């Protein structure tokens, strides 16, 4: 009787032993991670999908992107010059054509000073809109990287600022004598300047550790 029961249970035991390696392989496959995953990424980046790193390959190489970024910034700087003078000439020409009666004050101030201040305001407005005009002209002259959904340049901008935000020092510990160097990475125009920026951030972190006693950095 016991022999017959043992012969009946033996196939079941054999089936369990054959399923064990398969279950182990499934467990091993589920625990393995993709080479493109970033499990150590902070939680704050997962809560903001618009600023997350792309899963696929980047549309541009980093040297090419940094070179284009430098050109775009140069365009923004150069266009600020004509827009500043344009605002000055337009504002000065308009307010110079107005009749100014010294006996009629504007908010208790003589019209000459009010018109002069308004002219300077037009000049400042032209200076402020210069970078926007330069960025627009740069996009029009580089349609292959500035157009698309999303545009290649926009993808690289997001990836660049993601790396800047991830590697820059914590600004909460800055002081007048120890300011965070290049907080937005505006001076980065090449890979060498990016490495220098990383070194500057590391130096700042060391200064913050020794300059803020009692803080667990």
UniProtKB/Swiss-Prot annotation:
Q: Which family does it belong to?
A: Belongs to the PAM17 family.
Membrane topology (UniProt): Multi-pass membrane protein
Per the record, the coiled-coil ranges are: none
Q: Which PANTHER family match?
A: PRESEQUENCE TRANSLOCATED-ASSOCIATED MOTOR SUBUNIT PAM17, MITOCHONDRIAL
Main location per the UniProt record: mitochondrion
Q: Where is the composition biased (Low complexity)?
A: 33-45
Look up the transit peptide and give its residue range: 1-28
Q: Which UniProt keywords apply?
A: Membrane, Mitochondrion, Mitochondrion inner membrane, Protein transport, Transit peptide, Translocation, Transmembrane, Transmembrane helix, Transport
> What is the name attached to this protein's record?
Presequence translocated-associated motor subunit PAM17, mitochondrial
Q: Name one GO biological process term.
A: protein import into mitochondrial matrix
Tell me which GO cellular component terms the UniProt record holds: PAM complex, Tim23 associated import motor
Q: Where is the composition biased (Polar residues)?
A: 46-55
What role is this protein assigned? Component of the PAM complex, a complex required for the translocation of transit peptide-containing proteins from the inner membrane into the mitochondrial matrix in an ATP-dependent manner.
- Give any Pfam family that matches: Pam17
What InterPro entries does UniProt report for this protein, alphabetically? Pam17 (IPR013875)
Q: Tell me the organism.
A: Cryptococcus neoformans var. neoformans serotype D (strain JEC21 / ATCC MYA-565)
Q: How does it assemble?
A: Component of the PAM complex, at least composed of mtHsp70 (SSC1), MGE1, TIM44, PAM16, PAM17 and PAM18.
Ranges for the region named Disordered are 33-56
Name the residues that span the membrane: 78-98, 126-146
Q: Tell where it localizes.
A: Mitochondrion inner membrane
